[in-house]
A protein has these predicted regions:
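ATP-binding catalytic core of ATPases
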Residues: 403-454
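Basic, amphipathic juxtamembrane/active-site segments
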Residues: 394-417, 508-509, 514
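N-terminal targeting leaders characterized by basic, low-complexity, disordered sequences
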Residues: 1-95
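Asp-based phosphoryl-transfer active-site loop
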Residues: 375-399
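Conserved ATP-binding TGD loop and adjacent catalytic N/P-domain core of P-type ATPases
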Residues: 458-460, 495-630
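Structural motif at membrane-water interfaces of alpha-helical integral membrane proteins
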Residues: 5-20, 80-204, 210-302, 588, ...
C-alpha cells in the first residue's frame, strides 16, 4: 500500500466531552483540577533561626550549629570541604543488608526461522521415543500389578524370577530411550544447577543397581524393584521434553511465516497512567531470546532440587544404615529419588503450552516464551483499531455516484487522499479503488478531524469527506431520495462531488472474541478513526456488547492509535493475521497458560516433598510390602492428575 508522510497538521474540533473525560482520567489535586505540583518555596528563616547557634550540647531534633563540622575521630572539617562518610569497619553488625543475586543474562537472540529449523530437527524421532517408552512403562506397570498381590488370581501367573528378569530388561530399554533426559540431568549436575532431570538420573541409577543386586545377590525379600515408577518418571520427563520442543517449534514456525508481523506488548501510561495491550507492526527482535528463557515453574523446582538431593541421601542413610538395615540402602535410594523426581516436573508449563499452542498456531498466534507470558500479567485493557473490528475485506463498496462536473477519477483521488491522511480503517478499501480507477493520491496540506467527518486542504481547495450527518452540519444539501446509512460523501469547495455507498460486514468471530475478553477481565478500548464507527452506529448494528466497550473521545483515540508509541520491554505474542480474534486469543491464552503453570508448579513441588517424607517413613520401617512398585506408581500417577486436569482446563473457554 503506498504511504506518504501525511499532512503537516492534524487538528481537532473542540469536543465538550473531552475536558470532562480528561478530568476523570487525571487525579485531582487539593487546589483544583488545573493546579500543578509546585516545588517547596524557600523563604526567609523563621524568627529564632537566624544568628549564631547556642553554645553547648544540643538535643536531638534541634538545628545543626553553623561553622566547621566535626568529622568522626574528633577532626574538624573546613566548611568548603565535603565530609567523608564513615567507612564500615570489621566490628559487629547484627543487621547486614543482603546483596541481591545478580540476574543471569538472557539467552542469545536468533531469527524465528532458524529456531524453527533447530527445534524441528529430530522432533518426530523424539515423539517415537516417547511412544515406545510409554509402551514399555505400561508393560512394567502390569508386571508391578502382578507382583503386588492385589489380585490373588494373578499371583502364580508368572514365576518371580521371570518377572524380575523381564522387568529389568524392559527397564533397561526404557533407560536407553530416555538417554536425552539422563544426559541433560548429568549436564545440569556438572554445572552445579541440578534440576528434575538430575533427580531422574539418580532414580534410574539406583533402580538399576537395586535390580542388578537383586538378580545376583538377593539382599532382601523377593520383590520387584521400582522399575515401573522409575520408568514412568523417565517417560513423562521425556514427554515433557517433547512438549517443550513441539510448542517452541510451532511458535517459531508461525512467527517466521510473515516478514513483518504484528507484535503484542503491554505498553505503559496509556489510559490515565495505566497499562494496556496494544498490537503494532514491527520486527520481532528478542523473540528468540524469550523462547529460550527458562520458565518460572522450572526455576522454582530447580531451587528446590538441591534440598531434595540432600534430603534423599541423608534420609536414606538414616532410615537404613542407622536402623541396622544396610541391605535396603539401594532400595531406599531408588524409592526416595523416584518420589522426588515426580511425573509433572517438565509438564507444568510445557503441557498446557503445547495443548493451547496448537490451537493458537491455527489462528496465526505465536506466544513469545515465558517472558511473554509474564509480560501479560496485570493487563486489564486492550486497544482495538479499525482493522480489529472490521479487517480488510469486511468493508466493501456497494455503489458509487458522481455529482457535478468532476470525473470519477478526480473524485476518488480527493476522497482517498483525505482518508489516507486521517489514518482511517477505510484506507485499504479506497486504495483498491484508486488502483481500479487508475487514479493517484494528492498531497494533503492540512486536515481537521471531527467525529463524523474530515476537513482537508489540498492544492488550495477545501475537501470535505464524511457521512450524511457531517454534510448536513456543514450546510451541504444532499440530493433528495438518498438514504444511505453507511455512505461516504465528498465535497470540494462546499460543492458535493461524489458518494460512495459502503457495506460493513461484521465477521462472526468478532462478537465472541469481545465477549471472551470481557469474561477474562480485559476491557476492550475502541481507538478507531473511521467516522462511521461511532457508538451510535455500533449500537444500531446491535451485535456488539456496547455497554462493556470503552469509547474515548476523538483526540484520545487518534493519540492512542498513532505511530511511535512507547512499548513494553517484552513481546507477549506475535500475530500473523488481521482481526480481533488472534489478538484476543493471544491475550486470553497467555493468561490461562500462566495461571495453569503456577497451579501445576505448586502441586509438583508439594508432591515431591510429600513423596520424600512418605517414602522415608516407610523405608525406616522396612515396609517392603506397603511400599512396592505398584503402590509407588499409583502414588505418582495420582499426583499427576491435578497437572493433567489443569492443563486440560486451559483449552476450555
Amino acid at each position: 500500500m503506498p504511504q506518504d508522510d501525511g499532512p503537516e497538521l492534524i487538528a481537532f474540533t473542540p469536543d465538550p466531552k473531552a475536558a470532562a473525560q480528561q478530568a476523570q482520567d487525571q487525579p485531582a489535586t487539593p487546589e483544583g483540577d488545573g493546579a500543578a505540583e509546585q516545588p517547596p518555596m524557600q523563604g526567609p528563616p523563621a524568627p529564632g533561626q537566624t544568628g549564631q547557634a547556642a553554645q553547648g550540647p544540643q538535643a536531638p531534633g534541634q538545628g545543626t550549629p553553623t561553622g566547621p563540622k566535626a568529622a568522626p575521630g574528633g577532626q574538624t572539617v573546613p566548611p568548603g570541604k565535603p565530609q567523608t562518610p564513615p567507612q564500615e569497619g570489621t566490628g559487629f553488625h547484627p543487621f547486614r543488608e543482603r546483596k541481591a543475586r545478580a540476574e543471569a543474562p538472557p539467552p542469545p537472540d536468533a531469527p524465528p526461522a532458524q529456531l524453527a529449523e533447530e527445534y524441528g530437527l529430530g522432533l518426530q524421532a523424539l515423539k517415537g521415543k516417547c511412544t515406545a517408552a510409554g509402551v514399555l512403562s505400561a508393560v512394567l506397570l502390569l508386571f508391578a500389578l502382578l507382583d503386588s498381590g492385589v489380585l490373588p488370581v494373578l499371583d502364580s501367573l508368572l514365576p518371580a524370577n521371570i518377572l524380575l528378569l523381564g522387568s529389568l530388561a524392559l527397564f533397561a530399554g526404557c533407560v536407553l530411550l530416555s538417554l536425552d533426559v539422563l544426559k541433560e540431568g548429568l549436564v545440569q549436575l556438572t554445572n552445579l544447577a541440578p534440576n528434575g532431570d538430575t533427580l531422574a538420573l539418580f532414580a534410574a541409577l539406583f533402580t538399576l543397581v537395586d535390580g542388578v543386586t537383586m538378580v545376583f545377590t538377593p539382599l532382601r525379600e523377593s520383590a520387584i524393584p521400582f522399575f515401573s515408577p522409575c520408568a514412568l518418571v523417565l517417560t513423562f520427563h521425556l514427554l515433557g521434553r517433547y512438549c517443550d520442543r513441539s510448542a517452541k517449534f510451532q511458535a517459531c514456525r508461525v512467527a517466521a511465516s510473515v516478514s513483518q508481523p504484528y507484535l503484542v506488548t503491554q505498553d505503559p501510561n496509556v489510559l490515565g497512567g495505566r497499562t494496556a495491550f496494544r498490537k503494532w507492526l514491527g520486527v520481532p527482535k528478542g523473540f528468540g531470546s524469550q523462547i529460550r528463557t527458562t520458565s518460572q515453574a522450572e526455576a522454582r523446582f530447580r531451587r528446590l532440587t538441591p534440598v531434595l538431593l540432600v534430603a534423599c541421601f541423608c534420609l536414606s542413610l538414616v532410615t537404613t544404615v542407622a536402623h541396622h538395615q544396610p541391605n535396603l540402602v539401594f532400595w531406599s535410594l531408588s524409592a526416595l529419588f523416584t518420589a522426588a523426581a515426580t511425573l509433572g516436573v517438565s509438564l507444568a508449563l510445557n503441557l498446557p503450552l503445547r495443548m493451547l499452542g496448537g490451537k493458537l498456531a491455527k489462528l496465526g498466534v505465536a506466544l513469545a516464551g515465558w517472558p511473554g507470558l509474564l509480560a501479560g500479567k496485570g493487563g486489564k485493557a486492550a486497544l482495538l483499531l479499525d482493522q480489529d473490528i472490521y479487517p480488510p475485506g469486511t468493508v466493501a463498496l456497494a455503489g458509487s455516484r458522481v455529482f457535478g462536473s468532476l470525473s470519477m477519477e478526480r473524485t476518488v483521488a480527493f476522497t482517498a487522499s483525505v482518508i489516507r491522511a486521517s489514518g482511517s480503517g477505510l484506507t485499504y478499501l479506497f486504495d483498491k479503488l484508486v488502483r481500479a480507477e487508475g487514479s493517484g493520491y494528492l498531497p494533503i496540506e492540512k486536515i481537521v478531524m471531527q467525529e463524523t467527518g474530515l476537513l482537508g486542504q489540498c492544492q488550495g481547495q477545501q475537501i470535505l469527506v464524511g457521512n450524511s450527518d457531517f454534510m448536513s452540519r456543514q450546510g451541504i444539501a444532499l440530493p433528495p431520495g438518498i438514504r444511505a446509512k453507511d455512505a461516504v460523501f465528498c465535497a470540494v469547495d462546499r460543492e458535493l462531488v461524489g458518494m460512495f455507498v459502503l457495506k460493513y460486514t461484521l465477521h462472526p468471530a468478532i462478537t465472541p472474541a469481545l465477549q471472551s475478553m470481557v469474561l477474562h477481565r480485559i476491557a476492550p478500548v475502541m481507538v478507531t478513526r473511521d467516522f462511521n464507527l461511532n457508538p451510535h452506529r455500533l449500537r444500531l448494528w446491535g451485535r456488539l456488547p456496547m455497554d462493556q466497550l470503552t469509547f474515548p473521545d476523538l483526540q484520545r483515540r487518534v493519540t492512542l492509535s498513532g505511530p511511535n508509541q512507547p512499548h513494553g520491554p517484552a513481546i507477549l505474542a506475535v500475530l500473523c493475521r488481521e482481526g480481533i480474534a488472534p489478538f484476543s486469543q493471544a491475550l486470553i491464552g497467555a493468561k490461562r497458560i500462566r495461571r495453569a503453570a503456577a497451579f501445576s508448579s505448586f502441586f509438583v513441588n508439594f508432591s515431591a516433598c510429600v513423596g520424600v517424607v512418605l517414602t522415608a517413613s516407610l523405608s525406616s520401617a522396612g515396609a517392603l510390602g506397603a511400599m512396592c512398585a505398584w503402590h509407588l506408581s499409583l502414588f505418582l500417577l495420582l499426583w499427576l492428575v491435578p497437572v493433567l486436569l489443569i492443563s486440560l482446563w486451559t483449552t476450555q473457554y
